[in-house]
């Protein structure tokens, strides 16, 4: 609420895998504290006034490693909170959980089931054929949403290598220029489920124009960047946005369900037969010498990447670095003499197995920085 001005702040701190402390009260927006070298710290902040305490901010992490020669900046760009996909036209109305289940603040048990009837003409019909009728498959089930702690998950994996210093920030300070990516040997951008859905009151976007400009500038300065998230391609549909994807990230977006031509070769006479096939993704991925799965269906443990994307390499020096089980491209890597990038079609933090997630992240950083 804009008129709710804070009079003080509470800084909560956690060390390593430990829980957060009871907080330290500060009266200004600046604070200095002594941190031990070699120890990973996590912070979140709440605002306070006579009316009480706010929700806390996203969790940010920091590590000073005296033996490290390289520094990684983790940038959180996953701030979205949203209802399921709104359907509202002359013929249909409702919430389509299959199209987009939305993003709750943390856990929610708010759904009885997926809406099955969207026909406006059935409004007022209180039977299973009436507008808004839903299933009951989700009764009593919790669904994980945005916990705002994914910087912590990435930082924990990076710290396991013992090779890097770690800093972190919100994407807003990157877009505003307050934090310069050029000061870091690699940037890890967390996009999560960030996208402009067209119906949420707040504006969310995978790459705002300001963030695009910051990434362009970082690339021109020889930057090394990892980007992971669910809507890298589908949220960038204007001519200028698609130029950013192809010119800077060296990729193009292929919609799931589109038709591609598959060429079958007869091993006996080498004749080629062409046929149409439907391109699709899978919750199983192979890449970097590993095979793994990510959260693809709604569950109580972690938010799900229900709409991963197919990202195809564009131009010289770009190549497919991960594949879904269906054979389609799950990630695009680019390595030239000027800059490097690695873009995934699903959120890295959604990889289910923690050890595998750490191996994937460290493998990508090795590609970017070695």
PLM feature segments, named:
Residues 5-38, 51:
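Recognizes extended acidic, P/S/T-rich segments that occur
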Residues 37, 48-69:
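Extracellular fibronectin type III
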Residues 41-45:
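Hydrophobic/tyrosine-rich beta-strand signature of extracellular beta-sandwich/beta-rich modules
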Residues 67-148, 219, 236-237, 243-258, ...:
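Extracellular ligand-binding/catalytic regions of CAZymes and related secreted enzymes
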Residues 75-79, 169-172, 189-194, 221, ...:
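Active-site-proximal beta-strand/loop segments in catalytic clefts of secreted hydrolases
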Residues 113-244:
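Helical hinge/lid and interdomain linker segments adjacent to catalytic or ligand-binding clefts
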Residues 193-300, 360:
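A glycine-rich, often tryptophan-bearing local segment used as a flexible ligand/cofactor-contacting loop or short
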């Amino acid at each position: 609420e804009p008129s709710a001005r804070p009079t003080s702040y509470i800084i909560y701190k956690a060390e390593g895998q430990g829980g957060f402390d009871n907080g330290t009260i500060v009266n200004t927006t600046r604070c200095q504290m002594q941190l031990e070298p070699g120890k990973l710290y996590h912070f979140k902040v709440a605002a306070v006034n006579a009316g009480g305490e706010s929700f806390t901010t996203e969790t940010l992490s920091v590590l000073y490693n005296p033996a490290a020669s390289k520094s990684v900046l983790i940038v959180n760009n996953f701030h979205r909170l949203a209802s399921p996909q709104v359907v509202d036209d002359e013929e249909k109305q409702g919430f389509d959980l299959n199209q987009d289940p939305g993003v709750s603040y943390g856990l929610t048990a708010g759904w009885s089931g997926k809406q099955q009837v969207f026909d406006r003409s059935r409004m007022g019909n209180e039977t299973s054929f009436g507008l808004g009728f839903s299933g009951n498959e989700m009764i009593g089930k919790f669904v994980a949403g945005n916990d705002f702690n994914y910087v912590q998950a990435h930082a924990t994996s990076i710290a396991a290598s013992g090779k890097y210093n770690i800093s972190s920030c919100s994407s807003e300070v990157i877009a505003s220029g307050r934090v310069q990516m050029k000061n870091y040997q690699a940037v890890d951008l967390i996009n999560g489920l960030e996208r402009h859905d067209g119906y949420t009151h707040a504006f969310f976007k995978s790459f705002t124009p300001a963030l695009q400009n910051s990434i362009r500038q970082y690339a021109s300065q020889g930057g090394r960047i990892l980007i992971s998230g669910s809507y890298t391609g589908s949220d960038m549909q204007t001519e200028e946005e698609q130029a950013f994807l192809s010119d800077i990230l060296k990729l193009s977006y292929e919609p799931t369900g589109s038709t591609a031509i598959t060429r079958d070769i007869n091993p006996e006479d080498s004749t080629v037969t062409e046929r149409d096939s439907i391109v699709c993704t899978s919750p199983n991925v192979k890449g970097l010498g590993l095979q793994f799965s990510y959260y693809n269906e709604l569950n109580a443990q972690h938010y799900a990447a229900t709409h991963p994307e197919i990202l195809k390499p564009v131009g010289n020096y770009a190549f497919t670095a991960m594949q879904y089980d269906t054979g389609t491209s799950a990630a695009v890597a680019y390595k030239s003499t000027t800059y490097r990038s690695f873009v995934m079609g699903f959120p890295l933090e959604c990889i289910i197995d923690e050890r595998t997630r750490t191996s994937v992240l460290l493998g990508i950083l090795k590609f970017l920085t070695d």
